Amino acid sequence: MSYTKYQRGYFMPPTPSLEWSKKEYIAKAPIWCSVDLRDGNQALITPMSLEEKITFFKLLLKVGFKEIEVGFPAASETEYRFLRTLIEEDLIPDDVSVQVLTQAREHIIKKTFESLEGCKNAIVHVYNSTSYAQREQVFRKSKDEIKHIACEGAICLKESAAATKGNFRFEYSPESFSGTEVDYALEVCNAVIDIFEPTLEKKLIINLPVTVEMSLPHIYASQVEYMSKHLKNRENVLISLHPHNDRGCAIADAELGLLAGADRIEGTLFGNGERTGNVDIITLAMNMHSHGVDPKLDFSNIPSICDVYEKVTKMQVYERQPYSGKLVFAAFSGSHQDAIAKGMAYHKEHNLSTWSVPYLPIDPKDVGRVYESDVIRINSQSGKGGIAYILHHHYGVNLPPLFREEFSYYVKNISDKAHKELSPDEICEIFQNDFVNLNNTLCVQDFHFTHIDSKPSQEFNVKLHILYAKENSKTQQEITGKGNGRLDSIANALREHLNLDFEIIDYSEHSLKKGSTSQAVSYVQIESKGKKCFGVGIDNDIITASIYGLVSALNRII
C-alpha cells in the first residue's frame, strides 16, 4: 500500500476553541430526522417498492420520528408517486413534517413544489456542493460562482414556497462540508441566511454534512462549533448534522457535534446508507438512554424493528450492531456469565432502582431482549455460572456449587465436540437425559423401610428390589441393608450385595416449585476409587428423589 499519495483533505476552522470538550455528556435529545427513505433507500441493492416504503414510513412514525425525509421527488417518478400517495391518502400525521430534497436548480425546485401540493407540513432541503475538490474537479467554478448557485437556489425556493399553499420550512446544506474550507462554508451559509430571513417561528435549518468522513471526530466538532458561533441570526437557525461513516466514526462525529452546538441529527436506522453508511440513530438514541437522558424515540421493541427493516430493505442487521444485533448482549465467556448472573441476582436482592450490571451497559429488556435467550449463551467457552443460570431460569433447578463445576465441564465438552452453541432446551435435555433418574445399569424398583427399634429413631432397615445389568445380562434381586437414615441404609445395601465401593460425599435438595404439590430434587455426589460424580433424583416424594439421586450417581460411575 502506498500511503504517500494521501494527504489530509479537511480544513481546520480559523480559530478553533474546543470549548465543547468541557461538556461531559449530551444533556437533551436533538431533533431527529430519518433519511431512511431517501439516503438509505438509494444505497439498497434493490430499492424499496411503494408498498415497502409505506410500511417503513409507518414504522418510523411508530418509533416517534417527527421529521422524515421521503425522497427527491423531482428526480424520480417512484419518489414523486410515493410522496403523492402519502399526501393523497392522508398518511402524514399533523405533527409530522416530511422532508424532500432538491438541487439548487430552478426547474427541479419548481417540480419539487408541485409534488408537495396539499402537504400540510414540509421541509424543503436544497443543497449544492462547496468542497475544494468538487469546485476544482467537478464544477470547475470559483468560490463566488459556487456561492451564487446557493443564493439563486435559496431565492427560487423562497419564491416557490410563497406561491404554493402549505406550511414550508427550509434547509440548506453546503454539501461535502467535510471537505470545504470552514470560513468559506460560513460565508455561503450566511449568504443563504440573509436570503431566507429566518424567524423564531420559522427557523432555517443549516445542515453540515460529513458527506465523506475525512477527519477525527474532534476536528468535525471544532468545525461545527466555529459555525455555531459565527452563523448570522443564530437564534433563528437550527444546526443539523448528517454524518457518514467512512472512517467508522459517524457516532462520535454526531455526539461531539451535538456537544459543539448542533440541534438536529439526520441519520438512518442501523446506519444504512451510501458506502459505509449513515450515522445509526438507534445507537445514538440508546447511548443517550444509557446516560439517563430521554432520547424521545421508542426503541423498546428492537426485534420487531429489525424484522420490518430486514423484510423491506432485504438487508441484514449485523449480529454485533450496538443495541440492535442478536448477539450484543450475549455472554459466552464463563467469567462474564458469572458476573452477569451475580449482578442480576444482586439487583433483584437489593431492589435497586438504577441499572449497574457488569458487562451489560443497559437492561436488555429496555429494547425487547430476553435475559434467558439473549444474554446467557452457552458454548465451549462458557462457565459454570452461565450454565447454572440457564438451568435455574428454564428448569427451576439450583445446582449446588460442586455440581455446577462438574456439569459445566460436561456441557462444554459436548459443545466443543459438536462445534456449536447449545440452546437452553439442549442444555436441559442433557441435564435430564444424562443426570436425572438414571436406571440404565442399576434400577431400584421398590423399597420398604422399617425402624430398627420399636420406637422412632434414625436407624432403619431397608428391603428393596433392584434390577442390575452386568455383563450383558439383567438380574432381578431382593436385597436388604441397614443404616443411620434411609439414604444410608440404601447405600449400605447396595455396597454389600453388589460389591460396590463408594462413599456419599455431598448431598443437597430443594423444591422445584413452591407449594405442597411441587416436586423435590436431590443432588447426590459419590466418590469411588478416586472418581467423583453427581446424580440427580426428581420425584414428588423427597425420600424417593434422594434414592433416585444416589442411583443416578452410581449409574454414572459404574
From Swiss-Prot:
Pathway: Amino-acid biosynthesis; L-leucine biosynthesis; L-leucine from 3-methyl-2-oxobutanoate: step 1/4
GO cellular component: cytoplasm
Stretch list, region Regulatory domain: 438-558
Domain of life the protein comes from: Bacteria
Location of this chain's protein in the cell: Cytoplasm
Claim: Aminoacyl-tRNA synthetase is one of the keywords in the record: no
EC number: 2.3.3.13
MF terms (GO), sorted A to Z: 2-isopropylmalate synthase activity; acetyl-CoA C-acetyltransferase activity; magnesium ion binding
One Pfam entry name: IPMS_D2
InterPro entries: 2-isopropylmalate_synth_dimer, AIPM/Hcit_synth_CS, Aldolase_TIM, IPM_Synthase, LeuA-like_post-cat, LeuA_allosteric_dom_sf, LeuA_N_DRE-TIM, PYR_CT
Cofactor(s) recorded in Swiss-Prot or TrEMBL: Mg(2+)
Catalytic reaction equation(s): 3-methyl-2-oxobutanoate + acetyl-CoA + H2O = (2S)-2-isopropylmalate + CoA + H(+)
Keyword Acyltransferase appears in the UniProt entry: no
Subunit details: Homodimer.
Similarity remark: Belongs to the alpha-IPM synthase/homocitrate synthase family. LeuA type 2 subfamily.
Name this polypeptide is given: 2-isopropylmalate synthase
